Amino acid sequence: MKSSELFNRAKTLMPGGVSSPVRAIKPYPFYVERAAGSHLTTVDGADLIDCCLGYGPLILGHAHPEVREAIERQLEKGWLYGTPTPLELDLAGIITGDHPAVEMVRFVSSGSEATMAAIRLARGYTGKQDIIKIEGGFHGAHDAVLVKAGSGATTLGVPDSAGVLADLTAHTRQVPYNDTEALEALLAGNDDVAAFILEPVMGNVGPVLPDDGYLADVREITAAHDVLLILDEVITGYRAGIGGAEVLYDVKPDLATFGKIIGGGLPIGAFGGRCDIMELVAPAGPVYQAGTFSGNPASLAAGYATLRHLHDHPEIYRRLDDATRAIGEAAADAGKGTFVRIGSLFKHFFRDAAPRDYREVKECDTEAFSRFWKAMLEAGIFLPPSQFETNFLSAAHTTQDIKQIAEAYGSCLFA
């Protein structure tokens, strides 16, 4: 069956015909038959260079041999036990070793679950009720953070979701990104704030980069007010380099959350931080968290193989940085909009200057982006289909892939 036929069938079986809203490309999404390296093959026979990469987890590309072999070895031994496994220690050891602020870690099944648990833990540790998030910051699809949320929520025009209780979101405050004065003012009038959760780089509407010194100032301000700092590294973890944004920007949070890359393309999440905080998590303490699939062996195997490969080949990060720089140079030569990148994350904003916060991102010309996205797809390049999502590269993207992406940029920006 062709993509259009599959989608017509899907709409009779699933809300909107998809399992996640961002996949509902108009007039219908393309369906993927297989993927390898940096390429996708659709059921319609199209071959596409993939700059979505499952929205970030696949930093080594699709079906990387070492990751595939690790999964296959684990599947031969079983894929769900309901008991601890040695693989938990392997992956936990790498994560805690790479992140100075993460002394202990708990595995869960998604990034959303990780941020949900981290917020609960912060409230349990401090005895306070309120949390602060960034306007447009996206921390998953759970109720406490579906307030002025980015990512697909902004794409669909529903940053504040129906069905979320006002009594709950009354305890979720927001400040603009890159605005320490707003943070200071909010904290000065509220002594019931448990935590400030933020993406160190706004990956779900961007990337939108922190001003020089912003994260250091945030750390100083939160510490002065006895507010826990939660770094959401679900996107930046192992994307920004070994040690993520914590190491890149030299900022030490109280708690951090992870997902995507640490599972090598299989479902996973994790939250971690200081021992005195983490030891409140059940069964060691009174903050309850549990899950049937937490620490799933197949996900742990894929994640460990991925992180081990990144450690063995640190040159991957330099090569990916060079690749996004080359694409950015082509975009600059075209002279339309603004190209922003950090490592293997990149995005073209249809506005005159790089945005500093969510409000400026929303000023982008989304119709121009839509024309650009369609032209890139016709040129054989799949980008996330929203002005409010980040593009990704992987170690599997070849020199020819990068050349093709850069050349397409030059013409497609004027679609």
Swiss-Prot record:
Keyword Transferase: no
Enzyme class: isomerase
Main location, first listed in the record: cytoplasm
Keywords: Cytoplasm, Isomerase, Porphyrin biosynthesis, Pyridoxal phosphate
Swiss-Prot/TrEMBL GO biological process terms: protoporphyrinogen IX biosynthetic process
EC number(s) reported in the record: 5.4.3.8
A Pfam family the protein falls into: Aminotran_3
Residues found modified as N6-(pyridoxal phosphate)lysine: K260
Catalysed reactions listed for this entry: (S)-4-amino-5-oxopentanoate = 5-aminolevulinate
CDD domains in the cross-refs: OAT_like
Cellular localisation: Cytoplasm
Top-level division of the source organism's lineage: Archaea
PANTHER family for this protein: GLUTAMATE-1-SEMIALDEHYDE 2,1-AMINOMUTASE, GLUTAMATE-1-SEMIALDEHYDE 2,1-AMINOMUTASE 1, CHLOROPLASTIC-RELATED
Name of the molecule in the record: Glutamate-1-semialdehyde 2,1-aminomutase
